[in-house]
């Protein structure tokens, strides 16, 4: 397969067929069918697995087989099908080779006619994909239980189903990648600031990367300060959460092939929120969120405060606890600082092994790691006592 240029389509059907054979002739899933309608030679091209032969037969070939009144040449046939027929064609005819390749790769069936420099793309997409399931990384007790999938238009339809207003807008764009991956910018025109939307479009259009596999690829290009440790965007796999963010005036970015939606702009406090906070009472939800903040502060500053207190300010520790800590440190071959780093490193190794290993052994790895760490802690406790 070679690279398609932006040259216009030829008038001769044989020339366009030769171009398609040059591009996709070596692919076993590429399918073409030549036929004649009202004396006009035509050709249908599609990819098996991306387009449905059943849809093509029912909607296109059956209608074309009935004959096209008054059409004796290719340009008249294309014009009639594009403007007067009820077939599901794209709004704009294909005029260049690049558009032809992108339409075929997008799962459409393309009709080429002799003597016409335009082609028609029919919406016969039938791409296999994962069905809607429960979100794996955002569990909740109440509320919707559906999650995004890898199909871009299905994800947009999930948002459209919950956001039933005319101000909801989903703009599908093509990334500047070799694979020409599609992404969607979803927002509410009545709530999202127009200047923010325009700035975001310009930044995303200027992204130059070889491949776009996930919405997280855009994160580094949206950050103004590269040294800022706080995330520039939030992520969710729940359509309900994405819809709630759109109602707040934020912008949601969906990428074809990714079940993860990016929400911009994002605040650090929003990473502690979940759907259950809004389905519970205000007092209970506030206490749970406060607990999350305390847990975060403890996880971030707890090890450092412990090392600081043991190494540099032992007078801050109660005497009876300090004596037990001293006994434990006497039997430990490492000082407090390297000891804490070693424990943190071991925890990260166990977590990474449990996350990346195959599912058949990941639970075993996590269980063995927990048993080893627990046994070490119990043994250390016994030695102190």
What residues fall within each predicted segment?
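Membrane-embedded alpha-helical signal segments
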Residues: 1-301, 315, 319
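Short glycine-/small-residue-rich flexible loop motifs, especially phosphate/cofactor-binding loops
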Residues: 160, 243, 347, 374-375
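Core alpha-helical transmembrane segments of integral membrane proteins
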Residues: 282-352
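Membrane-helix interface "capping/anchor" motifs
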Residues: 291, 352-362, 378-380
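Small-residue-enriched core segments of transmembrane alpha-helices in multipass membrane transport
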Residues: 293-300, 364-376
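Short alpha-helical transmembrane interface motifs in multi-pass membrane proteins
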Residues: 331, 355-358, 373
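Membrane-helix boundary elements
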Residues: 339, 349, 372-373, 378
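Conserved small/polar residues in nucleotide/adenosyl-binding loops
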Residues: 384
């Amino acid at each position: 397969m070679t690279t398609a240029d932006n040259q216009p389509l030829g008038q001769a059907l044989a020339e366009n067929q030769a171009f398609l054979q040059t591009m996709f002739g070596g692919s076993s899933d590429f399918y073409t069918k030549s036929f004649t309608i009202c004396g006009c030679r035509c050709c249908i091209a599609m990819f098996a697995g991306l387009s449905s032969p059943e849809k093509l037969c029912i909607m296109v070939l059956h209608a074309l087989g009935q004959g096209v009144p008054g059409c004796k040449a290719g340009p008249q046939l294309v014009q009639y099908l594009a403007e007067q027929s009820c077939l599901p064609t794209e709004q704009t005819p294909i005029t260049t080779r690049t558009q032809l390749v992108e339409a075929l790769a997008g799962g459409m069936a393309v009709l080429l006619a002799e003597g016409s420099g335009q082609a028609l793309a029919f919406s016969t997409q039938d791409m296999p994909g994962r069905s809607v399931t429960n979100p794996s990384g955002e569990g909740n007790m109440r509320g919707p239980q559906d999650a995004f999938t890898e199909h871009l238009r299905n994800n947009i339809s999930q948002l459209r189903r919950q956001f039933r207003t005319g101000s909801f807008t989903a703009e599908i764009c093509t990334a500047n990648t070799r694979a020409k991956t599609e992404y969607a910018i979803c927002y509410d025109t009545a709530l999202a600031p127009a200047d923010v939307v325009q700035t975001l479009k310009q930044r995303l259009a200027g992204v130059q990367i070889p491949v776009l596999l996930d919405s997280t690829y855009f994160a580094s290009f949206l950050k103004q300060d590269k040294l800022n440790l706080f995330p520039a965007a939030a992520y969710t796999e729940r359509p309900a959460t994405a819809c709630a963010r759109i109602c707040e005036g934020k912008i949601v970015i969906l990428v074809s092939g990714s079940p993860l939606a990016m929400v911009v702009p994002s605040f650090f406090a929003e990473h502690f929120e979940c759907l259950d906070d809004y389905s519970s009472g205000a007092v209970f939800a506030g206490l749970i969120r406060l607990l999350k903040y305390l847990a975060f502060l403890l996880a971030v500053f707890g090890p450092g405060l412990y090392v600081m207190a043991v190494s540099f300010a032992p007078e801050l520790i109660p005497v009876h606890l300090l004596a037990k800590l001293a006994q434990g440190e006497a039997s430990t071959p490492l000082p407090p600082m390297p000891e804490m780093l070693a424990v943190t490193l071991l925890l990260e190794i166990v977590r990474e092994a449990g996350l990346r290993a195959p599912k058949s052994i990941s639970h075993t790895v996590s269980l063995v790691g927990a048993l080893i760490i627990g046994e070490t802690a119990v043994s250390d406790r016994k030695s102190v006592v």
